[in-house]
Amino acid sequence: MSLEAIVFDRSELENVSVKVLDQLLLPYTTKYVPIHTIDDGYSVIKSMQVRGAPAIAIVGSLSVLTEVQLIKHNPTSDVATLYSLVNWESTKTVLNKRLDFLLSSRPTAVNLSNSLVEIKNILKSSSDLKAFDGSLYNYVCELIDEDLANNMKMGDNGAKYLIDVLQKDGFKDEFAVLTICNTGSLATSGYGTALGVIRSLWKDSLAKTDKADSGLDNEKCPRMGHVFPLETRPYNQGSRLTAYELVYDKIPSTLITDSSIAYRIRTSPIPIKAAFVGADRIVRNGDTANKIGTLQLAVICKQFGIKFFVVAPKTTIDNVTETGDDIIVEERNPEEFKVVTGTVINPENGSLILNESGEPITGKVGIAPLEINVWNPAFDITPHELIDGIITEEGVFTKNSSGEFQLESLF
């Protein structure tokens, strides 16, 4: 990708630099927001300038690292006044409270919770601020590197599994897939989770096409030929972000509205064989919290006999919560649902309208009466009964003969 969601300069251990891409301005404007403190991390997560469970965990962890380095090197900074730096026990107490505050930015995303628990453990075992800084730096670097490696594994695991299933079913033609929200490079350290599987399927398709064109392999076999990303209201992560990534990678795709899924499945010239979605939290029985609209997609896939897969690293699995009934679902500000935010364009030719500084102008357009009541949950819960497989870096987990997932090996 030409755009990185997170820019982390780790060249200087004692003076790291962190910037995150303001994804609210995509696809027309590229602007990075610097992260110096936990407050900065909280702000970009809460406002959804950064989103995607893996990316949220990474940015949250990085914001802790930048704050720790700031108070260590600049004890007169504003944020340093929150701490009693002469007393390590007092400093740890304040840091623990700051970590709890950071978690409140996105309570549904278990990756952030898991990362902050790990950071609290590092804090507990650290003898002083310098030791904590060094251990935290190593943890964050490992978190980022492992996320990218695991994304590649998930992509290949999911692609191979679907191709094998289709071959066993005797399907040998071109097929399409569905996806919702954004689960690609912009939601992770790179490559993506659900969109990573789609990238791997596209690589497989290109390789098969090359072999066929060169005469090395004339046998018909299943290959992905098209992707249908859902727009994903009300924040339009599908139209703003996933569509951007698909266009950049030159993967054949057609954007569809959330309300047109069933009709698209019924009328698609290319048979739709699977849906791949990400996850913000997967509990012990496989129930999954993900972007609002995921449950609707799962129900429709069940109706049409389309395979429905959740793609997430094992860090997204909550080994404490038994069922989805106990997941806390964040509700967004009702006002967000009454407007559409975007870049202003010239209606005659589609060109961007720029301000005096030459930057694209963004604005909000009201789409609902201000007096109307609004229910605006950020997520919904898909019961495990509607999920055909959970794709992780460890492999693809399917249900047993009793219709239950057995995820204990991932805990």
From Swiss-Prot:
The active site is at D280 (proton donor). SUPFAM superfamilies: NagB/RpiA/CoA transferase-like (SSF100950). It comes from the Eukaryota. Its EC number is 5.3.1.23. The modification Phosphoserine is found at S351. The record marks C181 as: Transition state stabilizer. It catalyses: 5-(methylsulfanyl)-alpha-D-ribose 1-phosphate = 5-(methylsulfanyl)-D-ribulose 1-phosphate. Keywords: Acetylation, Amino-acid biosynthesis, Cytoplasm, Isomerase, Methionine biosynthesis, Nucleus, Phosphoprotein. One of its GO terms (cellular component) is nucleus. Its main location: cytoplasm. Pathway: Amino-acid biosynthesis; L-methionine biosynthesis via salvage pathway; L-methionine from S-methyl-5-thio-alpha-D-ribose 1-phosphate: step 1/6. NCBIfam families: eIF-2B_rel (TIGR00524), PRK05720.1 (NF004326), salvage_mtnA (TIGR00512). Belongs to the eIF-2B alpha/beta/delta subunits family. MtnA subfamily. Homodimer. Catalyzes the interconversion of methylthioribose-1-phosphate (MTR-1-P) into methylthioribulose-1-phosphate (MTRu-1-P). This is Methylthioribose-1-phosphate isomerase. It comes from Saccharomyces cerevisiae (strain JAY291). The gene is MRI1.
